[in-house]
Amino acid sequence: MNRHDNFDFTLVCTVKFYRGKRSLPPDLSNGKYCPHFMIKTDTRYLGICFIEGQRADLETLVKSLVVPLYEEVDYSGLVCGTEFYIMEGQNKVGEGIIDEII
């Protein structure tokens, strides 16, 4: 059982990764890329995992499916239309928007 199997929702997002922050775009479809989202109007880190997505090129918008990771974290700020940064540690490596919650 994956740690993200405890949630009953998946986020459909459009994301892009910044050139100069990563040498290569991450693989969004293998369930192993687990950065954090930081809502643009907040400073809290929200642990997530990309479980499906188009092949990402740097600075290109791609669709992806994302699930939350931690039961004790409040993900209620992640609603349709929420804009966020993709964080790797202190580094903003990309950004995106939540298009749908399924």
Task: Label each residue range with its predicted role.
Residues 1-102:
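C-terminal effector/interaction modules appended to NTPase cores
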